[in-house]
Amino acid sequence: MCGKSLLCVASLLASAYLVYCTQYVTVFYGVPVWRNASIPLFCATKNRDTWGTIQCKPDNDDYQEITLNVTEAFDAWDNTVTEQAVEDVWSLFETSIKPCVKLTPLCVAMSCNSTTNNTTTTGSTTGMSEINETSPSYSDNCTGLGKEEIVNCQFYMTGLERDKKKQYNETWYSKDVVCESNNTKDGKNRCYMNHCNTSVITESCDKHYWDAIKFRYCAPPGYALLRCNDTNYSGFEPKCSKVVASTCTRMMETQTSTWFGFNGTRAENRTYIYWHGRDNRTIISLNKYYNLSIHCKRPGNKTVVPITLMSGLVFHSQPINTRPRQAWCWFKGKWREAMQEVKQTLIKHPRYKGTNDTKNINFTKPGRGSDPEVAYMWTNCRGEFLYCNMTWFLNWVENRPNQTQHNYAPCHIRQIINTWHKVGKNVYLPPREGQLTCNSTVTSIIANIDVNSNQTNITFSAEVAELYRLELGDYKLIEVTPIGFAPTREKRYSSAPVRNKRGVFVLGFLGFLATAGSAMGAASLTLSAQSRTLLAGIVQQQQQLLDVVKRQQEMLRLTVWGTKNLQARVTAIEKYLKDQAQLNSWGCAFRQVCHTTVPWVNDSLSPDWNNMTWQEWEKQVRYLEANISQSLEQAQIQQEKNMYELQKLNSWDVFGNWFDLTSWIKYIQYGVYIVVGVIVLRIAIYIVQLLSRLRKGYRPVFSSPPGYLQQIHIHTDRGQPANEGTEEDDRDDDGYDL
């Protein structure tokens, strides 16, 4: 008896546990959760008058940053923001300079001879070691800038007259042609244009300027940008604890140069180094206290001579000049002090494992055999490509004895340029006529750190893309995923719709991210306001993008921004519709907290509502999302079936429905069906009974009787009874009187 009682009690307890302790999936909309993303960004700028920024969104500096109490991983090299910057700047650069005509006709044999009175690049050591604004060299050609060795070539091609060959004269730098050593005739060598058979070469159609463009990147609606705000961030940080969120990056300027970065926006009153997480690539931000700058100048005049190769094809050449090396660059500022601080900062870097003696840390040039863009400092000055030999400058910075030291570098302008982002070569027009000058602020150094046992070399690099690792490497693009799952004991939820107060304070799109560092319980209490903030921000960003698209309908093909802006808007709409469609498929449309009937899949996995953030919880349940989503969809399908059946029953609950005309027509229809059914049933029953009687030998009642003779019974006379009075009474009823 006692055992049965215990069993009953245990059963009751188990039932109560299943009823009250079972947890169900609850859908939350508006939670501060995100994932890494790689969608196209769009641009914003203040100056929309230039061709490169006319399609950008107007910049109003209204980009507040919100501090997040979270920890995130940042990597300047594995970063979609920096990759997009490199691709976009390259597209703008290529569109601006416009190389377009293939020069395969120049891959012909040429008869060349060297010009006279040529000197080597750095053979002259005369002149002042340092110059400034008041020096004569600043306004004229600097003494000591050697002449570039050039060659004068002749070749024959079919010109406008197809049946005749015409002789052409062309001047090349000696490094732009390759000559056969054992093939000389009359003191002339047989030469070809260098690299003509190894790359696709194009020539510029017209002369264009490459002006720097200032812009910032902005995330589409539904996305955001996180930034590591840690001063010790060095380009790779798996756990950055000082994170801020924004919709746009800082303002940046397009840069295209090797060795140095010009006019960057990351310069501070300190020197810091971004170091690649897996190799020796670095980008060094220079201290702006030292006022480092570069001033480049091309004195004198130049003339351009067009050469008609054939109908519709013109190659632009320049005549032999007594001073082919046309440019030089002067470095201003406290360069020696700045370079010394770079060495000291390198020693303190956590990844540095070399010598601690700054005397054994040297700035060096790349090795021989490198491309010209690597061996020389390459930059663009007013549309002209300068190649500067930095030997004198490095000797001056390092104060190397017995070496030629100058704070300026000799430069020359080239026509054949190696593309800095893709493999290939472009041929541009010779320099435009007149004097050219350009001034820039030096803000960074691109270098590789080569560490030996007792010596460290800081070798200058030609990785132009590294400039954008420094500019945008502390950002990362995220996709806001405001839909979250968590287990609760509530099986279903129903309440009257709550009316929103008019005075709700909206922080903007990033307002709900401010609760990312809060506990899950605290963040869940404000989901209504957060979801309204999220939707309001998305609508606001979409409206801004729509304004841009309306103004750029006729200029979508000019720059890369037109396509990216349209793609950003489409991405935003797709994301919003995807979230709403997903909520609707679960039966949770327009609800901030949606309780379901789906049991929680893992009872051992439960959130800590008081101490765990939504981002931390999301990382734990991410592998369950597919199963949860499928279960929610199946439950919603079953719920819709149940609702359909219930709606069919609900039509009989309302008393007024009984008096509906359409209902009465149905009732009459049903009555006719019933009467006809009863008649048919009676006929069927009668036929069955008739058949059963026939089988037993009975005739139907309604059948005609066969002919027969009626028998009349004749009774014999009996004597008259004595008592006649009683005879009448006693006679047989069956008798007949005759």
UniProtKB/Swiss-Prot annotation:
GO cellular component terms attached to this protein's record: host cell endosome membrane; host cell plasma membrane; membrane; viral envelope; virion membrane
Glycan attachment points: 36, 69, 113, 117-118, 132, 141, 169, 182, 197, 229, 232, 263, 269, 280, 291, 301, 356, 362, 389, 402, 439, 454, 457, 602, 611, 627
Region (Immunosuppression): 566-582
Residues the UniProt record annotates as site (Cleavage): 502-503
Cytoplasmic topological segments: 692-738
Chain intervals for the UniProt region annotation (V4): 388-411
Stretch list, region Disordered: 716-738
Function: The surface protein gp120 (SU) attaches the virus to the host lymphoid cell by binding to the primary receptor CD4. This interaction induces a structural rearrangement creating a high affinity binding site for a chemokine coreceptor like CXCR4 and/or CCR5. This peculiar 2 stage receptor-interaction strategy allows gp120 to maintain the highly conserved coreceptor-binding site in a cryptic conformation, protected from neutralizing antibodies. Since CD4 also displays a binding site for the disulfide-isomerase P4HB/PDI, a P4HB/PDI-CD4-CXCR4-gp120 complex may form.
Any further remark recorded for this protein: Some HIV-2 isolates have been described that can infect cells independently of CD4, using CXCR4 as primary receptor. These isolates may have an exposed coreceptor binding site.
Name assigned to this protein: Envelope glycoprotein gp160
Organism from which the protein derives: Human immunodeficiency virus type 2 subtype A (isolate Ghana-1) (HIV-2)
